[in-house]
Amino acid sequence: MQKYDLLIVGAGISGLSSAYHIKSENPDLNICVLDKGSTYAQGNTAKSAAAFRDVFTSETNYKLASSSISFYKDVQRKGFNLGMHFNGYLFLMDKDNLNSPAVRKLLNKVKSKIISREEISELGIRTNPDPDAASIMNLRNIEGGLVGENCGIMEPDLLASFYVTKLENMGVEFRFNTNVERLSIAPRNKLNFPGEPFIWQDKVIESVETSKGDFFADQFLLATDVWTNDLLRPLGIDAFTQPKKVQVFQVQSEEISKMMTRKVTGEEDLFPFTILPSPTIDLRPDPKSKMFWVSYVEGIGRGFSLEENPTADEDYYSNNLYTVLREYVPAFSNSRIRSSWAGFYSMNNMDGTYVFERHMNLSVVNGSSGSGIMKADAAGMVAAALFSGKQSTRLYGGSEINVADLGLSKRKVDQETLII
């Protein structure tokens, strides 16, 4: 029976970053990463829009994102291509939002600027949608835009590949096509009586039951995203997160292709990652295909449910997203869907950021809430501190964060006031 020092379940971006930082701090640890996929980053990491921003009013969110962006930037600068493009985030806003305290705070906090209605029109965006359509669909006129300049897009497979390359060089073992079905609990000190563990015994996770047999370890870490509930509920542990389906549509037209080179910031001629004012539909430029990836995170109306192989619904696009898009962006009028896919966000509905919890010899990294890529490296550093029992950790770039602030019992995450 092989026994590891640490068994990590989940080879998505959170699991890979956690493994990287734990192994970096503890080079002698014997670590194995399990995943049900045929290789790494095949779950929701692969389906991510993979955009990044440091435009957050919440200091917690800002620390996690800005630290990760700085790390990724340095990795790419040193020669490992992550597909990073600093084409900016463009938040299109009505008059009230543009003049809000949140925007004024951000202009003083992060590298950002305001662009005018005229500049927005030059991008190919209609600032005043048709009045009748606006009345029916609750569309807002655009007064201006907030541009986050230390923001942009990247390629999730390249980021995952960076971590895997480093981990393999450090001797971390990977076991793919290995579905973890159950966490097996046992008494810390066995009496070998039937019915153990009893309520008066200290308990630990002894092993994980998988499709490839049982794996044993001294310590365990779950980075299982929306599947965390399935593993924790049988133990009576609440993950405090829910799965939220997100659909992405790759949309093409001749006019959309022309829009791709219209920029608002950065050295490249590349359209910014853009968020419409209402509904807050995302437009993610894809420089390779010269198409937009279109997505929207629904609130009320989209239930919390989990499908094993989710698909995107083109009727949903036609009846919901397209009707809004053609009013704001005329280039969508003669467009067509070339591809589509769907995934899930692991939503922490308390404050929309990661949750780090420790139960027995089990660490849990959960609730990335759609920000997994942009906060992943910092999340891995917090996970390493949680694993080692440290009270705080110093993130890449020098900022410090308390581990308990991102837990549950002593959670201290300041409210995000830039609501998109």
Language-model regions: role of each:
Residues 49-132, 280:
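Dinucleotide-binding Rossmann-like beta1-alpha1 core, especially the glycine-rich loop
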